[in-house]
Regions:
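Hydrophobic core segments of alpha-helical transmembrane domains in multi-pass membrane transport
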Residues: 12-24, 36-46, 77, 81, ...
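The feature identifies polytopic integral membrane transport proteins across all domains of life
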Residues: 58-61, 71-79, 102-112, 190-191, ...
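Membrane-embedded alpha-helical segments and adjacent helix-loop junctions characteristic
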Residues: 31-94, 154-229
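Transmembrane alpha-helical segments and their short flanking loops
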Residues: 130, 174, 185-197, 259-363
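Interfacial loop-to-helix junctions that mark the boundaries of transmembrane helices
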Residues: 2-7, 24-34, 127-137, 190-197, ...
């Protein structure tokens, strides 16, 4: 079954490469847009690599100190996602710490809620800055200095280099997407394929989900949506549906990240799915009410009537914040539901040698790795103790009770 799964993945990849190659031959504009997405995703990988360089103690200490209450957990999720521009990395860190027992499920869910709000900063960055200036000019010096720092032997300088290079690639990717859609206007108008009403809402929402699953990044999908909207290649209403879809589609990344984690990590991924799907459904049901709120807010904030990119960023912010506000009072019920769905396996007497705490996710960061190794060492000690006591036909409780050897 596993072999068949790998074969299907390879066939799908080959088919995807063939289709893309054909599209690139047919249109240089599609090549520019695809290159922009690829550069943007590479920038996100560089950013993640850079922040991982600071995860050898500092990030872990900050996480433990700033997540002891729900508001702090949400705040941590917002700030770290804003800095890293990757809710996926924040999710991975949260799952790792939860799997190692360094934070509770309650705290982990708080971080995920904050990360969802934090993703909106990417939309504001692109809509408010990326489309208004020649962002590529800022990218070049970042790439030069970033590369210079990457080749240094000092780990922290190398980390700074990856962060600078990552930001440079993000900006360069946005510029390529922007230019690609601008050039598209002269050859084809994608608005001809716009669909209005709830039919269009559902169709474009599923397109947003699919795009996010393919790119494994809601940030990249959102940037693509905003650049297309800025070039007047999609309608505002369809862009809102795509944004909702990108929010729902990002849960796939959380699910994939939890596959190698422990039970608690799977619970956190489940919470992520429940929140994003429920928020998406809520946004779809009240889409027109959200649009009215955005219009009033845009007028109050001085946003131009035809500045739909900023309105999209405002919409994305509103439906994520309202989703968090509605979720917080129901957290205890959500945790009960997750505990019911993900039940711990009962350890049988003949399974004393099973690994309990070690998992790939917890080994991603230094502090979590040390913690799970310590717990696993204690578990191994208990296993050995049990095996030896059974071999000697004595009870473990008697050995630890302080009884004399003769009495045992």
């Amino acid at each position: 079954v596993k072999h068949k799964g790998i074969t299907l993945k390879r066939i799908a990849l080959l088919l995807f490469v063939v289709i893309l190659s054909y599209l690139f031959i047919q249109s240089k504009n599609i090549l520019d847009i695809a290159a922009g997405v690829a550069i943007f995703l590479f920038g996100m990988l560089s950013l993640e690599e850079g922040f991982r360089a600071f995860a050898g103690g500092f990030l872990e200490k900050v996480l433990q100190k700033t997540t002891n209450t729900l508001p702090k957990s949400i705040g941590f999720g917002i700030i770290t996602t804003t800095l890293m521009q990757s809710s996926s990395l924040v999710s991975v860190i949260s799952i790792s710490f939860l799997s190692a027992g360094l934070i509770s499920l309650y705290q982990g869910i708080g971080i995920i809620l904050g990360a969802n709000i934090g993703t909106t900063t990417g939309a504001w960055l692109v809509a408010g800055f990326g489309l208004k200036v020649d962002i590529a000019t800022y990218a070049m010096p970042m790439l030069v200095f970033g590369t210079l720092f990457i080749f240094q032997s000092n780990k922290k300088l190398k980390g700074i280099g990856y962060v600078l290079a990552g930001l440079g690639f993000l900006f360069l990717g946005i510029a390529y997407m922007k230019d690609g859609f601008e050039a598209f206007k002269n050859s084809i108008d994608l608005r001809e394929y716009a669909i209005s009403g709830y039919k269009g809402l559902f169709i474009f929402m599923f397109i947003g989900i699919f795009a996010t699953v393919v790119m494994q990044s809601s940030h990249a999908t959102l940037v693509l949506i905003i650049t297309a909207l800025g070039a007047h290649q999609i309608t505002y209403e369809n862009a809102l549906a795509l944004a909702i879809g990108s929010n729902v589609g990002t849960t796939i990344t959380a699910i994939l990240g939890s596959l190698s984690s422990g039970l608690e990590g799977k619970k956190l991924a489940g919470a992520h799915v429940i929140f994003n799907v429920a928020t998406g459904i809520f946004a779809v049901i009240f889409i027109y009410q959200f649009k009215e709120i955005v219009e009033y807010s845009a007028e109050f904030l001085g946003i131009a009537k035809d500045d739909f990119t900023l309105k999209l960023a405002l919409f994305h912010t509103y439906f994520n914040i309202i989703g968090v506000i509605l979720t917080v009072p129901l957290l205890s019920y959500m945790i009960k539901l997750l505990n019911t769905i993900f039940k711990s396996k009962t350890i049988q007497k003949d399974e004393v040698d099973d690994v309990l705490f070690l998992n790939d996710t917890a080994l991603d960061f230094a502090d979590t790795a040390v913690n799970v190794l310590h717990k696993e060492a204690i578990h191994l000690y208990n296993n050995v103790f049990t095996i030896i006591s059974k071999g000697l036909s004595v009870y473990k409780e008697d050995i630890t009770s302080g009884m004399e050897v003769e009495d045992i």
